[in-house]
């Protein structure tokens, strides 16, 4: 299962200007906010969560919320993601991989997932 999302960094900057910290809290967990120190990073996190929901085939909504997807970094700074136990079990997900990049005012994320084998 694969999901991809592209977002304008300018769009995220406008979102932050309008909604501030409260807006960030709607889609980022507290530990993610600590990592998201630049608009580029925030845009990448937004794209990652959207790409993850697309890989699951749901989009963000009742089945999968922004806070069901936890983003963090490995010791070298590469992005990683973890699904909530509820979502992981419901969709029978075994593993997830994430890649995020930024270029010319855009952030893009790709998520690949493998289902558990019977």
UniProtKB/Swiss-Prot annotation:
It comes from the Bacteria. Pfam families: ACPS (PF01648). It is an enzyme of class 2 (transferase). Its cofactor is Mg(2+). It comes from Wolinella succinogenes (strain ATCC 29543 / DSM 1740 / CCUG 13145 / JCM 31913 / LMG 7466 / NCTC 11488 / FDC 602W) (Vibrio succinogenes). The lineage of its organism: Bacteria, Pseudomonadati, Campylobacterota, Epsilonproteobacteria, Campylobacterales. Mg(2+) binds at residues 5, 50. It catalyses: apo-[ACP] + CoA = holo-[ACP] + adenosine 3',5'-bisphosphate + H(+). InterPro entries: 4-PPantetheinyl_Trfase_dom, 4-PPantetheinyl_Trfase_dom_sf, ACPS, Ppantetheine-prot_Trfase_dom. Keywords: Cytoplasm, Fatty acid biosynthesis, Fatty acid metabolism, Lipid biosynthesis, Lipid metabolism, Magnesium, Metal-binding, Transferase. HAMAP family: AcpS. The keyword Metal-binding applies. GO terms for biological process: fatty acid biosynthetic process. Transfers the 4'-phosphopantetheine moiety from coenzyme A to a Ser of acyl-carrier-protein. GO terms for molecular function: holo-[acyl-carrier-protein] synthase activity; magnesium ion binding. Signal peptide: none annotated. It is found in: Cytoplasm. This is Holo-[acyl-carrier-protein] synthase. NCBIfam families: acpS, pantethn_trn. Its EC number is 2.7.8.7. Belongs to the P-Pant transferase superfamily. AcpS family.
């Amino acid at each position: 299962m694969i999901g991809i999302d592209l977002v304008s960094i300018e769009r995220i900057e406008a979102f932050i200007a309008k909604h501030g910290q409260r807006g960030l809290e709607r889609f980022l967990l507290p530990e993610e906010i600590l990592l998201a120190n630049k608009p580029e990073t925030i845009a990448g996190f937004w794209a990652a969560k959207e790409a993850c929901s697309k890989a699951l085939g749901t989009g963000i909504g009742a089945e999968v919320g922004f806070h069901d997807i936890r983003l963090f970094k490995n010791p070298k700074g590469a992005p990683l993601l973890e699904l909530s136990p509820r979502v992981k079990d419901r969709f029978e997900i075994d593993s997830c991989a994430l890649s995020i990049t930024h270029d010319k005012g855009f952030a893009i994320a790709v998520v690949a997932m493998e289902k558990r084998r019977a």
